[in-house]
Each structure stands twice: as structure tokens, then as C-alpha cells.
């Protein structure tokens, strides 16, 4: 059996930012034998924090065993090439101790804040995840999607973990759960991420 801790820091008016406390909690979780800590990404809100890669890097530098994971990287809000670079770099810094949780997002306020259209989230997510996987596993590639286009390029570094860190997909709706199951069945059960 494995034990994980999900951190959803909340900052109420007048409270200091929780970064020191987050690091203390992660270090304590490692001392207690927890296997993984999950960091939450939220924007324009008093809960979760926006800069998960920075928090993850700090956590990796202050621990030696516990896995550091995301719950989740909201892919429509990020450039997928940057996500691939950031998490491959963190995978090297942690010597394979990262998992990458991804999601499409569901909070209208966050989409409005980034000037994005919520009903485009699924397609933006799908394109971004495809780009990230290809960036991690192909020597070079180009992309011509609805939302992302770029000429042939090589994305570096490639991950420390081969072929890439474990990828976890968040799902709230029945539709998303069925879609994830369908992807796994289409892959004849060989998908390990």
C-alpha cells in the first residue's frame, strides 16, 4: 500500500503566503514515510498556488525520497513545449522522482483570467498532451494543430525517466473517465502512463 498527501494551500485575507509551510509539510510527509505529495495548481483564487514547477523544484531540493507530483498541470493554461521542458528538467533534478498530473481545467474564472474559452479546453488539452509526449519521446518534430503550430525542433532536455515521467490524468466528469478508458483500450492495454 502506498500513501500520498495532496496539498491544497489556502491563503485567506491577511495571511502570509504558505510556501515555507508547504515545504515543511512535504519534508514531514517524507519523514513519516509518505510515498508521494501532490501539488495543486489554481489561479486567481485563494486556494492552490499558480507556480507549481517552482514549488516542485524547491521540494525536490529539500527531500531525497518522496515523489513530487502535480494535481494538476492545467494544460490549456500553459505552452506545452514549456511544460515538457520544465517537467523534464525537474525529472532530472529529482533523479526520476516526479509524476506529472494533467487536466483540462473546469473553472470559468481561471479561463476568463487567461482570456481562454472554456468549451475549447478539451481540444487544447488533447493537443498539449500530444505535444508533451512527443517532445519527451521524439528526437525532433513539428506540429500543426488547431491551437499550436511550430516548425520542426528538438525539445531538451529529454526526461531522466524513460520514456518519460508517469503521466496521470484528472477526471471529474463521467465523459472524461470514459474517454480515458477508451484511450487505454485503443492502446490495447499497453499504455503505462
Protein language model annotation of sequence segments:
Residues 25-26, 37-39, 77-81, 96:
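Conserved N-terminal glycine/acidic-rich loop preference
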Residues 50, 74, 171:
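Conserved residues at beta->alpha junctions
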Residues 1-68, 163-165:
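N-terminal beta1-alpha1-beta2 module of alpha/beta enzyme domains
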Residues 14-21, 47-51, 78, 82, ...:
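Alpha-helix N-cap and loop-to-helix initiation/capping positions
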Residues 3-7, 37-39, 68-71, 98-102, ...:
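Hydrophobic faces of well-ordered beta-strands that scaffold small-molecule active sites
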Residues 9-10, 42-45, 72-81, 104-108:
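Acidic, glycine-rich active-site loops and adjacent beta-strand->loop/helix elements
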Residues 79-186:
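Internal, glycine-rich beta/alpha segment that forms the wall or movable "lid"
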Amino acid at each position: 500500500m502506498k500513501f500520498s498527501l495532496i496539498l491544497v494551500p489556502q491563503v485567506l485575507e491577511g495571511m502570509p503566503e504558505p510556501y515555507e509551510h508547504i515545504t515543511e509539510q512535504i519534508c514531514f510527509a517524507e519523514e513519516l514515510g509518505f510515498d508521494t505529495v501532490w501539488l495543486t495548481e489554481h489561479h486567481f483564487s485563494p486556494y492552490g498556488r499558480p507556480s507549481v514547477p517552482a514549488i516542485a523544484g524547491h521540494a525536490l531540493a529539500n527531500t531525497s525520497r518522496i515523489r513530487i507530483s502535480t494535481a494538476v498541470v492545467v494544460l490549456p493554461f500553459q505552452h506545452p513545449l514549456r511544460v515538457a521542458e520544465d517537467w523534464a528538467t525537474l525529472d532530472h533534478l529529482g533523479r526520476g522522482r516526479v509524476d506529472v498530473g494533467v487536466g483540462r481545467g473546469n473553472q470559468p474564472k481561471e479561463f476568463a483570467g487567461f482570456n481562454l474559452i472554456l468549451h475549447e479546453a478539451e481540444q487544447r488539452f488533447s493537443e498539449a498532451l500530444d505535444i508533451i509526449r512527443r517532445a519527451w519521446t521524439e528526437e525532433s518534430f513539428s506540429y500543426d494543430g488547431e491551437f499550436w503550430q511550430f516548425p520542426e525542433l528538438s525539445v531538451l532536455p529529454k526526461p531522466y525517466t524513460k520514456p518519460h515521467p508517469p503521466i496521470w490524468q484528472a477526471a471529474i466528469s463521467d465523459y472524461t473517465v470514459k474517454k480515458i478508458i477508451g484511450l487505454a483500450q485503443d492502446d490495447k492495454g499497453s499504455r503505462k502512463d
